[in-house]
């Protein structure tokens, strides 16, 4: 890795979106992590018939395809499709030859060991990368916010985690996983809008609801008070124009949708809300570092983009924590991509260059080298 001008490729594979690029300040390519296969092979006349479509192309042809997400709850469940996504990332999106670059990948906290090895194997054996490294998403988010100690709440499309990090290392015994994230909020909003008499069922309509969720929803500081206000007047109502020109009006759904993050019982889940998960994570850590964790709670991922979420987290945690504790919740404006940005920062550090797993090391030790070098 002595060559200074070889650019590292940074790939953050999320359950919903794949973010990829070089050592810049923002990802070059962001596309849906989906693979589509023709429902009825042979009838797509005139189209260059492929056996699979990836990302935006799969999205645009979804009427005639069966769409699958190879990453469920942050963990890769279908390796053939995952390989297709990586192939698409390198050759179609970034237009690079992976054998000429080192590649930095991200993984969920508590990723199964076998998965980590499989990832490493595919990178070296299928794509012949120069070198590679795997890092935990939450740790990268923390780097992007400019610190190495803190508690990260990372919530994406498929899964949420609360991860305590001390001096750059995640503390695995205290990590909490919550299978509640963006996809569930979209599902819930679809259901809630049905109560208003609007019908959203197909995958295409689901994308519309996701857009409504991203543009119009917010987290209420006081949910009951907000419900009362919404019931008494129409000041909280907003209208949204559908692609067919119809306009729908949404009122209390605007804050009922993300409230599920704090009260999962709204959708029949028995788990704790994100504030409670964060509190439990901190309480599982050594008493001496709790002050540092409370003082730097960092939000990351697309599902933390709701306006008002930072203030609400501060309020909820202040109620749970000891009264003398100073609590600071950080919600960086670029948090949608902070995992990727952290990866980009890490890959361009001169001190990081000796950390890569090289092709030679892989050939000598096999896939298990990843546990020794990436922890």
Swiss-Prot record:
Superkingdom to which the source organism belongs: Eukaryota
In its keyword annotation, does this UniProt entry include Nucleus?
A: no
Q: What is its EC number?
A: 3.6.4.-
- PROSITE patterns listed in its UniProt record: ACTINS_1 (PS00406), ACTINS_2 (PS00432)
Q: What are the recorded GO MF terms, alphabetically?
A: ATP binding; hydrolase activity
- Quickly give the catalysed reaction: ATP + H2O = ADP + phosphate + H(+)
One GO CC term, this protein: cytoplasm
Q: Which residues form a coiled coil?
A: none
The main place the protein resides is cytoplasm
Keywords in alphabetical order: ATP-binding, Cytoplasm, Cytoskeleton, Hydrolase, Nucleotide-binding
List locations, semicolon-separated. Cytoplasm, Cytoskeleton
Gene3D superfamilies, alphabetized = 3.30.420.40, Actin, Chain A, domain 4 (3.90.640.10)
Q: What class of enzyme is it?
A: hydrolase
Family per similarity comment: Belongs to the actin family.
Q: Which PANTHER family match?
A: ACTIN
What is the documented function of this protein? Actins are highly conserved proteins that are involved in various types of cell motility and are ubiquitously expressed in all eukaryotic cells. Essential component of cell cytoskeleton; plays an important role in cytoplasmic streaming, cell shape determination, cell division, organelle movement and extension growth.
**UniProt name for this protein:** Actin
């Amino acid at each position: 890795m002595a060559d200074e001008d070889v650019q590292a490729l940074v790939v953050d594979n999320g359950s919903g979106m794949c973010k990829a690029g070089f050592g810049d300040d923002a990802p070059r390519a962001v596309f849906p992590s989906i693979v589509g296969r023709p429902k009825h092979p042979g009838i797509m006349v005139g189209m260059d018939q492929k056996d699979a479509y990836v990302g935006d192309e799969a999205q645009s042809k979804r009427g005639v395809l069966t769409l699958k997400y190879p990453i469920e709850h942050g963990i890769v469940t279908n390796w053939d499709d995952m390989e297709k996504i990586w192939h698409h990332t390198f050759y179609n999106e970034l237009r690079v030859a992976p054998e000429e670059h080192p590649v930095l990948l991200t993984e969920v906290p508590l990723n199964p060991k076998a998965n980590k090895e499989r990832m490493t194997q595919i990178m070296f054996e299928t794509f012949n990368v120069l070198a590679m490294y795997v890092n935990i998403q939450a740790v990268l988010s923390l780097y992007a916010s400019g610190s190495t100690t803190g508690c990260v709440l990372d919530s994406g499309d498929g899964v949420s985690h609360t991860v305590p990090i001390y001096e750059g290392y995640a503390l695995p015994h205290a990590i909490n996983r919550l299978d509640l994230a963006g996809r569930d909020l979209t599902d819930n909003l679809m259901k809630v809008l049905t109560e208003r008499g609007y019908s959203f069922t197909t995958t295409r309509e689901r994308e519309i609801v996701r857009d409504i969720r991203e543009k119009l929803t917010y987290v209420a500081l006081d949910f009951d008070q907000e419900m009362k206000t919404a019931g008494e007047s129409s000041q909280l109502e907003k209208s949204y124009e559908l692609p067919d020109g119809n306009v729908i009006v949404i009122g209390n759904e605007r804050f009922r949708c993300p409230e599920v993050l704090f009260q999962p019982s709204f959708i029949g889940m028995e788990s704790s809300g994100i504030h409670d998960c964060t509190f439990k994570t901190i309480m599982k850590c050594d008493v001496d570092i709790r002050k540092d964790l409370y003082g730097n709670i960092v939000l990351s991922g697309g599902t933390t983009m709701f306006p008002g979420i930072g203030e609400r987290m501060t309020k909820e945690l202040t109620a749970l924590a000891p009264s003398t504790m100073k609590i600071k919740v950080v919600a960086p404006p670029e948090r949608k991509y902070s995992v990727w940005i952290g990866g980009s920062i890490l890959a361009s550090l001169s001190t990081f260059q000796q950390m890569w797993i090289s092709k030679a090391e892989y050939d000598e030790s096999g896939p298990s080298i990843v546990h020794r070098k990436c922890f």
